[in-house]
Structure formats: C-alpha cells, structure tokens
C-alpha cells in the first residue's frame, strides 16, 4: 500500500536499499509533497495549496528544526514574531497561519499515512500536534471586519461619484484620451456598489454574465448578474451566485446600457480580444490592482478617509438595503454570505435610520395602548 495512498510515506523513503543523504531535508520535502497530494485529493485549489506549503517552509526555516522536533513553543514564537514586527499581520491572517500549521500536524500524526512510525524508526522521534485551543487565536465574528472599515454615507458616495463624472467631462472637453478609461472606472465602481460585489467579482465580469429577470421586464438584459468568481470557503475555489437588480439601484441599468450597447466599451482597442466587461488599454481585462489604485486616487482627491477602500462599496450596499427595509435574509443571499452574522458586521446604519426605527416602534406601541383591539 505504501505510496499508493495520497500523502503516504513514499516508497523511496522506506526502501532499506536506498540511503538517505541529508535525511531530514528529504523527509520534510516528502512530507510536504504528501500533504500537497492529500489536499489535491480533497479538491482544494492549487493557489491555496501553494500558500499553505510555502507557509510551512517558512515556519521550518524560522525554527531551524523539522516536524518531528517541533514543539508548541515553536508555533508560539513564530506567531508572536509575526504579530510584533514593524508590520504586524492581522488577526485573520494569524488565524489562517495557525490553522495551516495545525492541519499539517494533523496530517503527519494521522496513523493512516505512516509518518509517525517512519520518523520513530528513522529519527527516534515522532511528529506531534503543536497547535491547541490555548495557543491558537480564537475565532469570533466580531473581528472579521476591521474596526476602521465602514460603509460610505450616501452623501460621501454622491461626492465621490460626482467628482469622477466631472473629471470624465473635463478630460473629454479637453480632448484627452484619458476620458475613456475614467468613464470605464466610473461605471465599474457604480456596478460594484449597485450589486454589492467584491473587487475580484467585479473585475472578472463578462458581458454574458448579465441576464433578464423574468419578473421585472423593465430592466431588460440587466435584471440580474451571474457572479462566477465569488469568494470560496476553505480553499474550495470560486463559488457562483446570482445577484438581482433591485429598485433602489436600478439607475445602474442605464449605466450598463451606455457602457455595452451604447458602444463605449467597444472604443477600447482591446475590446475584441475577449468578452471581459472591463477591457484595459493594453490587455483584454483590467487587473485587480488597477481598479484599487484608481479608486484610491479618486477617494483621496475628494478628501475621504483612507480606510474607505473599494470593498467599502460592498459594505455600503448592505447597509443601504437594510435601511431601505429589505429583509436581512434577502441581503445575505444577494451578497453571498454563508452566515447572517457576517452580513450583520457589514451593516453600519445611520443614526437617522436608528432614530426613525425607534420612533416607529414608539408610535406603534402608543397606537396599541390606545386601541388594544386594533
């Protein structure tokens, strides 16, 4: 059976006729190869696998020792070092790193793969689990969104979009070629807001991703958008979801019509290379970083806080739908959250909305007291 099961000790290591030069390094490499095979068999994405393996290599270099020598204090020192440097990692990243080390140790200590028996015979020591509840960061939903991240107010959004639109008009009037990329960015940011998209989801949109909503014919072919690159879970790769166009954001339909059937998109010389919704000046599709940089430049130009990034448009979508009276379960489905608690973290309703809600509840209670049978 040796070597036939993904992740099992390879035959080359257990063959007594094959000597092990620099045994510790070769065995560690084989362990990573086995873990990689196991994760592939589980259907994880190659990017997730690559990142996890690179982290374990980094951890090994930090300790200067190998898995059968690792102890809980090693992971304590590693994570503490990452949290105390000039650029400390976030709690979310810290949790991801500790989980990766824990999963690797779980793989090594599983009797089905034979690493414990092999290491005891070869090195006189065995791998053990070094990550426990008492030395791993606890997961609480409240730390999923940084404290500085919030929604845009409607006034801030109006100010931002007005600035970008005015900039497009000025560049066009001056005969500058910059007006077209600026117009593309303007439409892209509004689409991002009007559908509550993540940056990658927005960037990866194609023309074919839009379709009609049979129950709302007024929106034509822009009644819904099929999001094909939604955030996956546990390294499973992109998920899909359908986001409906809602009345509060139906102004985006005219924006999309102007961009597509209105011929604006086709003015890019690269437009015919693919069906990407957002072609760039030199390539078939815009990059994630380019949209982020363009948004940051516009935000800084109007003097908005730096913590208001492109992703905050998604927070704003959630908040403004809740303020408009949409059911929380519908909003959760629209943005593709697995848990309602995550949607709750994205919501930062205004004080006016809170006051109106309280006043409505007071008025309802007074009405019930005056007419109990009503």
Residue ranges and their predicted role:
Residues 1-62, 66-374:
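Conserved catalytic core of the tyrosine transesterase superfamily
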């Amino acid at each position: 059976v040796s070597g036939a099961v993904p992740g099992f000790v390879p035959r080359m290591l257990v063959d007594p006729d094959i000597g092990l030069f620099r045994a510790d390094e070769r065995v560690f490499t084989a362990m990573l190869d086995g873990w990689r095979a196991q994760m592939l068999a589980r259907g994880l994405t190659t990017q997730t696998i690559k990142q996890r393996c690179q982290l374990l290599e980094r951890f090994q270099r930090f300790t200067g020792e190998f898995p059968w020598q690792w102890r809980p204090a090693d992971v304590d020192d590693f994570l503490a070092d990452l949290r105390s440097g000039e650029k400390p990692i976030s709690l979310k990243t810290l949790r991801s790193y500790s989980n990766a080390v824990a999963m690797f140790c779980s793989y090594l200590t599983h009797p089905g793969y034979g690493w414990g028996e092999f290491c005891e015979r070869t090195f006189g020591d065995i791998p053990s689990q070094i990550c426990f509840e008492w030395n791993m960061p606890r997961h609480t939903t409240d730390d999923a969104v940084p404290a500085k991240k919030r929604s845009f107010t409607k006034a801030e959004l109006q100010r931002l979009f007005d600035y970008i639109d005015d900039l497009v008009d000025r560049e066009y009037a001056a005969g500058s070629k910059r007006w077209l990329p600026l117009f593309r960015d303007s439409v892209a940011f509004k689409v991002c807001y009007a559908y509550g998209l993540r940056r990658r989801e927005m960037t990866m949109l194609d023309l074919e991703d839009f379709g009609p909503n049979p129950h709302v014919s007024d929106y034509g072919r822009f009644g819904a958008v099929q999001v094909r690159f939604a955030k996956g879970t546990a390294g499973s790769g992109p998920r899909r979801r359908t986001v409906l166009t809602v009345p509060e954001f139906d102004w985006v339909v005219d924006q999309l019509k102007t961009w597509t059937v209105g011929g604006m998109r086709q003015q890019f010389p690269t437009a015919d290379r693919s069906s990407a919704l957002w072609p760039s000046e030199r390539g078939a599709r815009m990059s994630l970083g380019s949209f982020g940089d363009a948004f940051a430049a516009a935000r800084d130009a109007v003097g908005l806080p730096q913590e208001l990034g492109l992703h905050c448009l998604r927070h704003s979508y959630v908040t403004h739908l809740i303020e408009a009276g949409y059911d929380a379960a519908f909003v959760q489905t629209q943005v593709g959250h697995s848990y309602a608690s995550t949607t709750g973290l994205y919501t930062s309703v205004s004080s006016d909305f809170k006051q109106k809600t309280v006043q409505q509840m007071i008025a309802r209670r007074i009405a019930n007291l005056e007419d109990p049978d009503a």
